[in-house]
Design a protein with these regions (language model features):
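Bacterial Sec-dependent N-terminal signal peptides
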Residues: 1-22
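Extracellular polysaccharide-degrading/modifying enzymes targeting complex plant/algal/animal polysaccharides
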Residues: 111-189, 195-200, 269-271, 363-366
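Conserved small/polar residues in nucleotide/adenosyl-binding loops
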Residues: 434-439
Length: 439
């Protein structure tokens, strides 16, 4: 009885401690961010095992219609869990409906078709704009409470798309990312209280995980991978957070040939006035491991407002940039209250800020919108890198209220922090650097 009482008190104290943690702007972090129980499919309704409904284990047989029929059956009968058993199942675009969930058992593989005609063109969201484009392999729109779980794998089968992209780029060097027709792996939109846990998301033809206009999304213990060699997988961002709030990314491994965590939201000279766009707020990325990627945490390039963003307790190995602020001269942007702390490992650049001019277009706007990045804190960081401070001065944006606190940096290049670039730059405690000289 005494032990039980002690346990209860300890638990209450632990929850109280968590509840006192704050976002960078001082707001208390809600308890929701600390409740991370894994999905129990037994509490989600009837299980619909796809092989009970005519779907067979065959990696070469396209079975989109049969798998979709199981989803529709579940939806029409009060909802439930679509279960994919051990084996490999080839499919085009699948559309989940209210009350339905997806679970991949161990050694199960949902394999995407490498024929773009198996992904219908729909009204969707892509690269900061709402437009008609190809559906993803897994599409979840207006499905509150959706879960994707299990120890299986979603394989985008992207190599054919990647090779085609690079061939097009050789012939048309200025082609856009969307000119080469290819699907995303997972697109979740207008859905709240979503959880994606444990699965492996690999070899996406385009963006891997894209969430748009969602509230309360947890991405837990995912393994997200696309190769950087021998064939580079272009634009395969691990997680794109697009006009969302209350998002937790925890315990994930990410290694992709683009940005790992990319904060999106819109682009263009009037992007902040378009109701289809929006900011990202109250985002926590913690306890993750990052392999090769262009940016661990990237604001942009299609982004207008990011507020209360935390990246903490993460390990890096071969990432190019830790914090990358892409400043578009054709888009009004505000990146504020961003905290990066307790980071270890190696990276090419710790903080990278520069104008992003790819596909620059002011349209009919006469003046160039000025963007702002402020209240950016980096603390308790121990990294080996090529350079720490890669920040360009520009009239296109204003930087203010940055804080570097307790940084231990081993750099190949001299570490020079130009305090004239950032207004109200604060250097706290020991900021120690070791310059590795060539022998």
């Amino acid at each position: 009885m005494i032990k039980s009482a002690i346990l209860i008190v300890a638990t209450c104290c632990s929850l109280q401690l968590f509840s006192q943690e704050k976002f960078p702007d001082g707001k208390i972090i809600p308890d929701w961010f600390y409740k991370n129980e894994k999905t129990d499919i037994n509490g989600l309704g009837k299980n619909f095992l796809i092989t009970d409904y005519g779907v067979v284990n065959d990696s070469t047989l396209l079975q989109t219609e049969k798998i979709q029929a199981v989803i529709d059956l579940a939806s029409n009968n009060g909802g439930g869990v679509i279960v994919i058993p051990e084996g490999t199942y080839l499919s085009g675009a699948l559309f989940f409906k209210p009350g339905t969930h997806l679970h991949l058992e161990k050694k199960a593989v949902l394999k995407g078709s490498d024929d773009i005609s198996n992904f219908p063109v729909i009204e969707t969201r892509m690269e900061g704009q709402n437009l008609k484009y190809f559906s993803a392999l897994i599409n979840v729109d207006k499905v509150d409470g959706f879960t994707l779980s299990g120890k299986g794998k979603v394989d985008g089968n992207g190599e054919r798309y990647w090779k085609s992209f690079w061939l097009r780029r050789r012939v048309i060097p200025k082609c856009t990312n969307m000119d080469e027709l290819r699907p995303r792996l997972l697109h979740i939109s207008h859905s709240n209280n979503v959880q994606v846990s444990d699965v492996r998301l690999v070899n996406s033809p385009f963006w891997t995980t894209h969430i748009y206009k969602c509230d309360s999304v947890k991405l837990l213990n995912l393994h997200i991978f696309s190769p950087s060699f021998p064939v580079k997988a272009p634009s395969t961002d691990a997680i794109d957070i697009d006009a969302c709030k209350n998002v937790l990314v925890k315990g994930c491994y990410m290694s992709v040939n683009d940005d790992a965590i990319a904060l999106k939201g819109g682009k263009g000279p009037w992007a902040d006035q378009d109701p289809d766009n929006g900011g990202n707020c109250d985002i926590i990325i913690e306890d993750c491991t990052f392999g090769f990627c262009h940016g661990v945490l990237t604001c942009g390039s299609e982004s207008i407002y990011n507020h209360n963003i935390i990246l903490r307790r993460c390990n890096l190995d071969q990432a190019k940039r830790l914090l990358w602020l892409k400043m578009r001269p054709d888009t009004p942007q505000q990146y504020k209250y961003i905290l990066v702390e307790d980071i270890k490992g190696n990276v090419r650049n710790c903080i990278f800020i520069a104008p992003w001019t790819q596909f620059y277009d002011l349209k009919d706007r006469k003046d160039m919108p000025v963007s702002y990045s402020s209240y950016i804190t980096m603390r308790n960081i121990h990294l080996d890198c090529d350079s720490f401070f890669a920040v360009e001065k520009s009239k296109q944006y204003k930087l203010s209220n940055f804080c570097f606190d307790n940084l231990t940096i081993t750099a190949k290049k001299d570490v020079k922090i130009d305090e004239n670039i950032i207004d109200a730059l604060v250097m706290r405690k020991a900021v120690s650097y070791t310059h590795l000289r060539a022998h």
